[in-house]
């Protein structure tokens, strides 16, 4: 499963839910006819989205079988995922980009081979994506732009990203 969003809570009184998408585009989840919901990423419940619309960078969704606010409220906090087999394949060399979920948890080292930390998350700035790297032995994060000048190599097999970056830039 690949997590593509999280349910923020109910919307209105007719069973609609607010979904925070983790996709590049707000409507990215609308492409998938079947979703899987889970709190723990182990036990998945299959649901079918019936209707969608976008409101304030959130997806407002009606799921089949959920018709009132009470039932929708029970879904708050659940992760929204799809089977990896439903995602378009990407080239191994990164030409097509990367799925963010594949980058989270990867170790980050600088050009000298010094460990900086691990990827804790990513976000968009409009100009480019940014890695949020949890520094080794710390609870602090370093923000590193995900651009060619900085990201020198992404090796998904060895789970390592090499960056042209020094701490404190």
Curated annotation (Swiss-Prot):
SUPFAM superfamilies to which the protein is assigned, alphabetical: PRC-barrel domain, Translation proteins
Subcellular location: Cytoplasm
Name used for this protein in its record: Ribosome maturation factor RimM
UniProt gene name: rimM
Domain remarks: The PRC barrel domain binds ribosomal protein uS19.
Keyword Translocase: no
Family statement: Belongs to the RimM family.
Disulfide bonding pattern of the chain: none
Keywords linked to the UniProt accession: Chaperone, Cytoplasm, Ribosome biogenesis, rRNA processing
GO biological process, any: rRNA processing
A cellular component annotation (GO) from this entry: cytoplasm
Keyword Chaperone: yes
Assembly and binders: Binds ribosomal protein uS19.
Domain PRC barrel: 95-169
Pfam families tied to this protein: PRC_RimM, RimM
Gene Ontology MF term list: ribosome binding
Function: An accessory protein needed during the final step in the assembly of 30S ribosomal subunit, possibly for assembly of the head region. Essential for efficient processing of 16S rRNA. May be needed both before and after RbfA during the maturation of 16S rRNA. It has affinity for free ribosomal 30S subunits but not for 70S ribosomes.
Chief localisation class: cytoplasm
